[in-house]
Amino acid sequence: MHRYLLALLLALPMAMDVTPALAGEVSPEDSAALRKEVQAMMGGFARGDTELIIARTHPSLKQLAGGDEAYARATRDTVKALRKAGVTIISDEAGVPGRTYAAGDEEVCFVPRQSLLRVREAPMRSTSFMVAVRRVGTTQWRYLDGAAMLDNPALLRQLLPALEPGVTLPRGGMEAL
C-alpha cells in the first residue's frame, strides 16, 4: 500500500504538467525560428504594421499596459507618433539568440537586434534585443522589446518575476553615425 501511495505522489507532478524550466542552450531549429520571427516583427514595425507585434507580445506586457485593447492602442499610437516625428527604419537585423534561462514554467532567451534608422535626416544605430519567452514544452514564443529595459532593467523582473536570479541584460543603446 505504501509503495502505491509513494508512486502516486511521485507521478502527481507529471500528471499536473508543472515541469519547471531549465536553463540551457537554444537548439539550431529554435535559433533559426527565433531569428525569423524577430526579423518579421521588425519588418512589420518598419512598414508601420503593428498587428504581428501585437499578436506576438508576451501577455505580461499587455497586462501591465492595461489589457489587450489598451496595449494594441498604445502600440499603434507609438508607431504613428514615430512616423510623424520623422523616424524611418533603414535596415534591421536579428542576431543569434543566446542561451535560455528558467522562469518558472517558462523559458527565456535574448535575441540581439541591430537597426539603422534615420531620425529627421540624422542616421542612427540602435543596438537592442528582444526577450523571447515560451512555456516549457511548447514551440510558440512570445516577445518583449528589450529597448525599454536598457534604461529600466527592473522592468524585466516586473514582467517575468519567476526569472532565475543573476540574469543580466545584453548591452545596447543608440549611436549617432
Name each region found by the language model.
Residues E29, R35, E51-V108:
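Short solvent-exposed beta->alpha transition segments
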